[in-house]
Amino acid sequence: MAGSDEVNRNECKTVVPLHTWVLISNFKLSYNILRRADGTFERDLGEYLDRRVPANARPLEGVSSFDHIIDQSVGLEVRIYRAAAEGDAEEGAAAVTRPILEFLTDAPAAEPFPVIIFFHGGSFVHSSASSTIYDSLCRRFVKLSKGVVVSVNYRRAPEHRYPCAYDDGWTALKWVMSQPFMRSGGDAQARVFLSGDSSGGNIAHHVAVRAADEGVKVCGNILLNAMFGGTERTESERRLDGKYFVTLQDRDWYWKAYLPEDADRDHPACNPFGPNGRRLGGLPFAKSLIIVSGLDLTCDRQLAYADALREDGHHVKVVQCENATVGFYLLPNTVHYHEVMEEISDFLNANLYY
C-alpha cells in the first residue's frame, strides 16, 4: 500500500504545479488529522489550522470587503466584496464603518451589474468565507465581473447536518434580493448569480432549485468541481481513487457527516438526479456553467449532472479541463486557470441583460 501511495504522489507531482501540489497536500494532511473515525471532527483545531484573513474596508488591490451578520438567530455571516470606490484608499480607519452604514443603503445603480453569491468548498466541513484561499478567489471574481460578491459563511457539518447549509444559502439569497444597493437598471433587481466549488457547488445547485420553485430570478449558476455522489461507483471514481489528493474513503466520510444519519449516498442532497432525486423539466432553472476537472475522481458525476440538466431542457455549458485536479482554480499558475476565469467572465456578461 505504501508503494502504491508513493507511485500516486509521484504521478501527481508530474501533473500538478508545485505551488498547487504543496497547497492541496497540506490541506489533505490537516484534513486527515481533523477527521475522527467515529464521524466527529476536531473543530477547535480545524479553526486554528485554517489560514484566514480579516475583511478590509481599506482597499487591497482595488477590492474592499466587510463582514455582515444577516441572520442573528443562527449567527449567519456573509463577507461582501466590491470594487473600491473612489477615495476609499485615503479614508483610513474611517472606512471601516462607512460600508456597513452607507453601502447597504446606497441608491440603486443606473446599470445592471452582477452579484455573485458564493459558497466556499471544504466538503461541507472545512474552510470558511474568511479562509485565505476563498478570500483571494472572491477578490478575483470582483475584478473579472466588475460586480459584487457575497461569500456565505454557512453552517458546517457534522455539527450542522443537512439541510442547514441549504437553508443558509436560501437565507443569503433572500437577503441579497432585499438590499437597496442590489438593485439596478430602473430599480430592477441586480443580476444574481449563484456559484461555489466542491460542496459550495452542491449548495448552489440546491439553492437554485428552490429559487426556481419560488419564482426568485437567478441569472446563472457557476459550479466548480461540484460535489455530488451516489451509492454506485462511477468509472472515474474507481480509476482516480487516491491518485490526485482525494480518496473515496474521504468522500464517504464527508457525506456521512453531512447527510441525515439514516441516509445513504442516493439521498437527493448527494445524488440530485438519482433514484430518490427530482427531475427539473418545466422548471425555470437558471443557465449553468459547469467547470469539471478531468483528474477529479467525481468528474463523471459532474458530467452526468450536466447531461441531466440538458435532458430536462436547460441550458448548460461544460468546461472540461482534462489535466486539472481539484482546486486548480485557487492559484493562477496554469493555462486551465486563465481559461476558466475567461469562461466565467464571458458567462456573466452574456447573462447580465434579459
Curated annotation (Swiss-Prot):
GO terms for biological process: floral organ morphogenesis; gibberellic acid mediated signaling pathway; positive regulation of gibberellic acid mediated signaling pathway; raffinose family oligosaccharide biosynthetic process; response to gibberellin. Gibberellin A3 binds at residues 122-123, 134, 198, 250, 327. A motif (Involved in the stabilization of the negatively charged intermediate by the formation of the oxyanion hole) lies at residues 120-122. It comes from the Eukaryota. It is found in: Nucleus. Interacts with the DELLA protein SLR1 in a GA-dependent manner, resulting in subsequent SLR1 degradation. This is Gibberellin receptor GID1. It comes from Oryza sativa subsp. japonica (Rice). The gene is GID1.
